[in-house]
């Protein structure tokens, strides 16, 4: 009886071992298959830009830059799936739906803010807008551009670096005004005063005269000349001669002026400041990111003028490499799109290649060509460098 029981136990053990072996082999097979599926699965990033119509030059430059980024990353699983928005809001929604149907959850674009209007319908898709505006964006849109907050933060750092204590802020009465005001509130930058000005040049000069107390300083000069003329002071003729070479007399109650403007409007404001005898030699001229606009270097009367911006060395290298490959120069937005591809890949990698809308919620930093990206709670900001345009060149301060 004992031998019979032993044989039964032995047979049971043999069967159990075979069952366990079968289960282990099956599990290994499943794991290998699952791994193979994930290994073969493509990481698709959508790209929605204007590839036809008035702005096709911008879109095609962005597309080429993203392909350049893909080549740099050198991962065959990562692909860009582009679509033409025609710079139209309804077309933007249509092509975004097509990308969503392909299983794409992250889309770079659109370029222009007007094309964001319908995108909130696609709640499971995260859009990385190439715009630099943050206010009133749909909940699933993250601005990837060099926004006002990033720029004002850099200016605040420059204030501390240069011991600037009495800045006035000049803001144009434009759509960008609310972005600047929001950035000022969030960064808590130290300002002596803030003024909104009209972009119409015929109105602008009179506004700048009032801001700088030009009439009072002009009157001070006239009064002092008259006083000397009626006085018995020694060398009064020489003193009068020196005063007559001046435009105004009296101090300025600020040590720097932050001009939140660009291109010709920026130059108009600076010219009005010069007219009112407030030169960049008397106060610091500070402005926003000018993307190293070389026309500023020609305006010697405005120099030195300080501004936050991207990493110039990296930008110059990108422009050179882009030109060598495509035999044309890129636009500025294409440099941003190059970095956004790298940013998305970095965040997906950090999230174990799981693509969901949480990857932009976690606090992270990414060192791109532009500079350092800060990601937190579905917002992107940039740690910018600071430059001065002076003596026909752009010089890095920090």
Model-predicted segments: where are they?
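Classical Sec-dependent N-terminal signal peptides that target proteins to the secretory pathway
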Residues: 17-39
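Beta-alpha junction/loop-to-helix N-cap segments that form part of ligand/metal-binding clefts
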Residues: 42, 57-62, 75-137, 143-146
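Short, solvent-exposed amphipathic alpha-helices that sit
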Residues: 57-73, 91, 175-192, 207
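Structural motif
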Residues: 78-100, 151-154, 200-214, 236-243
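Extracytoplasmic ligand/sensor domains, especially the bilobed periplasmic-binding protein
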Residues: 106-170, 175-183, 189, 194
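Extracellular/periplasmic periplasmic-binding protein-like sensory domains
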Residues: 189, 210-222, 228-237, 252-256, ...
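Segments of small-molecule ligand-sensing domains
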Residues: 327-338, 343-394
């Amino acid at each position: 009886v004992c031998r019979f029981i032993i044989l039964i136990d032995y047979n049971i053990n043999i069967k159990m071992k075979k069952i366990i072996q079968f289960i282990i082999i099956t599990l290994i097979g499943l794991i290998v298959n699952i791994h193979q599926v994930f290994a073969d699965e493509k990481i698709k990033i959508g790209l929605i830009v204007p590839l036809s119509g008035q702005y096709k030059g911008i879109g095609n430059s962005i597309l080429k830059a993203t392909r350049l980024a893909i080549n740099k990353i050198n991962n065959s699983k990562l692909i860009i799936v582009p679509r033409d928005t025609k710079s139209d809001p309804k077309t933007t929604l249509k092509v975004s739906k097509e990308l969503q149907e392909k299983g794409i959850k992250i889309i770079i674009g659109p370029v222009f803010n007007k094309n964001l209007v319908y995108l909130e319908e696609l709640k499971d898709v995260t859009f990385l807008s190439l715009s630099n505006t943050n206010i009133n964006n749909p909940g699933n849109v993250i601005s990837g551009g060099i926004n006002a907050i990033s720029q004002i933060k850099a200016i605040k750092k420059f204030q501390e670096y240069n011991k600037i204590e009495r800045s006035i802020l000049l803001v144009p009465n434009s759509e960008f005004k609310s972005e600047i005001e929001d950035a000022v509130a969030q960064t808590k930058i130290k300002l002596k005063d803030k003024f909104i000005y009209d972009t119409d040049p015929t109105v602008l000069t009179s506004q700048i005269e009032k801001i700088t107390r030009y009439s009072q300083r002009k009157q001070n000069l006239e009064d002092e000349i008259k006083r000397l003329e009626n006085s018995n002071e020694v060398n009064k003729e020489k003193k009068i001669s020196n005063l007559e070479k001046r435009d105004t007399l009296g101090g300025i109650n600020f040590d720097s002026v932050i001009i939140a403007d660009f291109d010709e409007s920026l130059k108009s404001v600076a010219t009005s400041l010069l007219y009112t005898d407030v030169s960049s030699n008397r106060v610091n001229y500070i402005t926003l990111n000018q993307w190293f606009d070389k026309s500023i270097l020609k305006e010697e009367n405005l120099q030195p003028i300080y501004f936050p911006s991207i990493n110039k060395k990296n930008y110059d290298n990108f422009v050179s490499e882009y030109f060598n490959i495509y035999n044309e120069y890129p636009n500025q937005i294409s440099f941003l799109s190059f970095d956004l591809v790298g940013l998305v890949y970095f965040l997906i990698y950090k999230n174990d290649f799981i693509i969901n809308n949480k990857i932009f919620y976690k606090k992270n930093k990414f060192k791109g060509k532009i500079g350092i990206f800060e990601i937190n709670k579905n917002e992107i900001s940039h740690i910018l460098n600071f430059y001065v345009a002076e003596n026909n060149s752009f010089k890095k301060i920090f």
